[in-house]
Swiss-Prot record:
Keywords per UniProt: Isomerase
HAMAP family: Rib_5P_isom_A
GO biological processes: D-ribose metabolic process; pentose-phosphate shunt, non-oxidative branch
Reactions that this protein is recorded to catalyse: aldehydo-D-ribose 5-phosphate = D-ribulose 5-phosphate
Organism taxonomic ancestry: Bacteria, Pseudomonadati, Pseudomonadota, Gammaproteobacteria, Vibrionales
The protein's name in its UniProt record: Ribose-5-phosphate isomerase A
UniProt xrefs under SUPFAM superfamilies: D-ribose-5-phosphate isomerase (RpiA), lid domain, NagB/RpiA/CoA transferase-like
Pfam families referenced in this protein's UniProt entry, alphabetically: Rib_5-P_isom_A
Keyword Isomerase found: yes
Keyword Isomerase listed: yes
Pathway recorded for this protein: Carbohydrate degradation; pentose phosphate pathway; D-ribose 5-phosphate from D-ribulose 5-phosphate (non-oxidative stage): step 1/1
Protein family membership: Belongs to the ribose 5-phosphate isomerase family.
Catalytic residues as annotated in Swiss-Prot or TrEMBL: E103 (proton acceptor)
Length: 218
């Protein structure tokens, strides 16, 4: 089974958690694209979706799924999204696709976070994947200096503007042994919109695509 086939297995397995008549929180990325395709197969059974990115919104609309504004929804039953890394405590690094802030917002209004990944995303310690930080453009240099003080090696993601009009710093060489503490520290830097650590709001369910099919941990 290829890596993409494992992603597909995880994406389709997440349909188990979609309630009839519900509005579904939808993340961003290659694994989520498989979930969106799966959602299209039951589009008449759901009310619609709240999307975390322009890219996911376009894909949902192409499949005929109604997309609601986040401000028009009080609470979602589930949010389905991928991760760049996930540890045993279900804390994650996300934001490789630059949608981290909107992903955090949709996760915050969801009762259950279902994380869909392939087996390559599981790690013992977070930080091998560069940690994305969304930053107000005028604060980029200042935030980079502050991230160096925290032991990181930040790199400006050239040519990338987020859906919110901001920039991304990718922080390399971090051994993140206390994700919640680091999430708080980075979010406390002036000019940071949010950091791609999902530690305070980790995953409730992890669906991993494996060569044998989807493995579900609740």
């Amino acid at each position: 089974m290829t890596q993409d086939e494992m992603k597909k297995a995880a994406g389709w397995a997440a349909l188990k958690y979609v309630e009839k008549g519900s509005i579904v929180g939808v993340g961003t990325g290659s694994t989520v694209n498989h979930f969106i395709d799966a959602l299209g197969s039951i589009k008449d059974d759901i009310k619609g979706a709240v999307s975390s990115s322009v890219a996911s919104t376009e894909r949902l609309k192409e499949l005929g799924i109604e997309v609601y504004e986040c401000n028009d929804v009080a609470m979602l039953d589930i949010y389905v999204d991928g991760a760049d890394e996930i540890n045993a405590a279900r804390e994650m690094i996300k934001g490789g696709g630059a949608a981290l802030t909107r992903e955090k917002i949709v996760a915050a209004i969801s009762e259950k976070f279902v994380c869909i990944v392939d087996g390559t995303k599981a790690v013992d310690v977070l930080g091998q994947f560069p940690l994305p930080v969304e930053v107000i453009p005028m604060a980029r240099s200042y935030v980079a200096r502050e991230l160096v003080k925290l032991g990181g090696d930040p790199a400006y993601r050239e040519g990338v503007t987020t859906d919110n009009g901001n920039v991304i710093l990718d922080v390399h060489n971090m051994q993140i042994t206390n994700p919640k503490e680091l999430e708080d520290k980075i979010n406390g830097i002036a000019g940071v919109v949010t950091v791609g650590l999902f530690a305070h709001r980790g995953a409730d369910v992890v669906i991993t695509g494996t060569p044998e099919g989807a493995k579900i941990e609740e």
